[in-house]
Design a protein with these regions (language model features):
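Sec-dependent bacterial lipoprotein signal peptides
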Residues: 1-16
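Short, low-complexity N-terminal intrinsically disordered segments enriched in polar/charged residues
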Residues: 18-62
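Short beta-strand edge/turn micro-motifs at domain boundaries
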Residues: 22-24, 136-164
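A mature extracytoplasmic/lumenal domain signature
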Residues: 44, 63, 73-75, 121-125, ...
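Sec/Tat-exported extracytoplasmic proteins
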Residues: 44-47, 51-55, 63-67, 86-94, ...
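Hydrophobic pocket/interface hotspot
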Residues: 47, 59, 67, 78, ...
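A short acidic/glycine-rich loop-to-helix N-cap element
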Residues: 59, 130-134, 162-163
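Surface-exposed, charged secondary-structure patches
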Residues: 68, 83-131
Length: 164
């Protein structure tokens, strides 16, 4: 009987130690937001690496399959249309363009709300041969964690005219 009481007490202690409300502490929540912000920021870094290396596959790795992309008055829907835009139209990906994509870090903006968030950044494309800025693009994205990975679900981009 004494053995049964000791086993019962041990089981109760074990369940108490392992139990809990299932809610994350404030510190754990804050840490999760920081981790998610870091993962969302990786989208910007991947975008610029893809643009600088003309790697359309890498660019597409940050887009959700059913994403939308607004460029001026045009709306692209889904991976196929977005891929075609980068492969055939986007300046940094065009043959003969040797551009490096740079982002002013102080202009990057990230928000996180659970499995959704936003990402804003600017791209300054510099022609390697001349060292001149040839294009500036502002990109505003909605992102979402899908199957554990943060992806762009919608984006809007605009290019202001540069003074000559």
């Amino acid at each position: 009987m004494k053995r049964l009481a000791v086993l019962g007490l041990a089981a109760a202690l074990l369940l108490t130690a392992c139990g809990g409300s299932g809610k994350k502490s404030a510190a754990e929540q804050q840490l999760q937001v920081k981790a998610d912000s870091y993962a969302i920021d990786a989208i910007e870094k991947t975008w610029h690496k893809a643009a600088s290396t003309q790697n359309v596959d890498l660019m597409m790795s940050i887009w959700a399959p059913d994403a939308t992309f607004n460029i001026g008055p045009e709306t692209l829907s889904g991976s196929a249309q977005i891929r075609t835009f980068f492969a055939k139209t986007a300046g940094p990906f065009q043959p003969g363009h040797h551009w490096v994509s740079d982002t002013p870090a102080y202009k990057v903006r990230i928000t996180v709300n659970g499995d959704k968030g936003t990402l804003y950044f600017e791209c300054h494309y510099v022609d390697v041969a001349t060292g001149k800025v040839v294009s500036v693009v502002a990109a505003d994205q909605t992102v979402q964690r899908i199957d554990g990975k943060w992806l762009i679900t919608s984006a809007a981009a605009a290019t202001p005219k540069l003074a000559t």
